[in-house]
UniProtKB/Swiss-Prot annotation:
GO molecular function, one term: methyltransferase activity
Keywords, alphabetical: Methyltransferase, S-adenosyl-L-methionine, Transferase
Keyword S-adenosyl-L-methionine carried by entry: yes
Top-rank lineage group of the source organism: Bacteria
Protein name: Putative S-adenosyl-L-methionine-dependent methyltransferase MAB_4586c
Residues that bind S-adenosyl-L-methionine: D122, D151, L152
High-level lineage: Bacteria, Bacillati, Actinomycetota, Actinomycetes, Mycobacteriales
Annotated Pfam families: LCM
Function: Exhibits S-adenosyl-L-methionine-dependent methyltransferase activity.
Enzyme Commission number(s) of this protein: 2.1.1.-
Family: Belongs to the UPF0677 family.
GO BP annotations listed: methylation
């Protein structure tokens, strides 16, 4: 399904399906040595969604499946963003925002300090599905969890403020698996809004999208998000989902506005976590090596 302006999705179509594929990766990560994601809710999401190929891979712990290929890098990416939140909490940040939260369960599975609020923003149908699965399982969040049903191409800052977000307090922001799905102009606008809403001491961790022309190399290496199609299960192609149109140099842009930016290489991080990535297509290895960063707002906004 080719992306269109203002398009929407549920958990088994278009961009929503990729959140489900990531959940499958987190579920299978538990079978790797050592596991890095530690997500006890991921398998329940996959089982409830009605996506037979992913459900079968998770249920049988099929480590030869294409979903298992996802597991090795999804686990590393998950640990990277988990560590970011732990560092932010250790620095005293008590307000956190997960943009395009998908099936992220960090509000439940991370050991948050007392009086912590986690805001989750995503499409209404995605959040509804997640809430239903978590409710059936009896899961209880370890922080105050606030869901905000909004399209990030719309006025999400207004929706976030209405939900109780306090722009005078430091915030921990994560943009995990989001920016490749935004057109360049939408990404640039998102960071402008994020900067405007970030008090000194705020932090951000992000995964950037591909450069112009890079998408073709990635798509050639990884034909679909999770492998071949099967009956009744349509799996989207990266070319149909990601954007690689021109956009600002985000890291430089943030640096010019008082943020201290630190680049992150997830290939090196995997080694540090004790589980090196193996057999990655070169284009994908380059993506994991160059597209991640963290930043701290050290100075007043401007």
């Amino acid at each position: 399904m080719v992306r269109t302006e203002g398009d929407s999705w549920d958990i088994v179509t278009s961009v929503g399906y990729t959140a489900l594929a990531v959940a499958a990766g987190r579920a299978l990560d538990a079978k790797l040595d050592p596991p890095l994601a530690h997500d006890d809710h991921a398998a329940a999401f996959v089982a409830a969604a009605g996506a037979p190929q992913l459900a079968a891979a998770v249920a049988t712990a099929d480590m030869t499946s294409s979903a298992a290929f996802n597991a090795q890098w999804v686990g590393v990416r998950t640990r990277f963003f988990d560590n970011f939140f732990a560092d932010a909490a250790g620095a005293g940040v008590r307000q956190h925002v997960i943009l395009a939260a998908g099936l992220d369960s960090r509000a439940y599975r991370l050991p948050w300090p007392a009086i912590t609020t986690v805001f989750e923003l995503d499409q209404p149908k995605v959040l509804q599905f997640k809430d239903e699965v978590l409710k059936r399982s009896g899961a209880q969040p370890s922080a105050r969890r606030v869901t905000v049903a909004v399209d990030l191409r719309d006025d999400w800052p207004a929706a976030l403020r209405e939900a109780g977000f306090d722009a005078t307090q430091p915030t921990g922001w994560i943009l995990e698996g989001l920016l490749p799905y935004l057109p360049g102009a939408a990404q640039d606008a998102l960071f402008e809004r994020l900067n405007d809403m970030s008090a000194p001491g705020s932090r951000v961790a992000a995964e950037l999208g591909p450069e112009p022309g890079e998408l073709e190399r990635l798509a050639a290496s990884i034909k679909t998000v999770v492998g071949e199609t099967s009956d009744g299960e349509t799996q989207p192609n990266l070319r149909d989902l990601w954007f690689d149109d021109p956009r600002l140099d985000t890291k430089t842009w943030l640096g010019e506005r008082g943020w201290t930016v630190t680049e992150a290489n997830l290939v090196d991080a995997a080694v540090a976590y004790g589980r090196p990535l193996r057999d990655l297509p070169p284009a994908f290895e380059n993506f994991l090596s160059t597209k991640f960063f963290t930043a701290v707002q050290d100075h007043p906004r401007g």
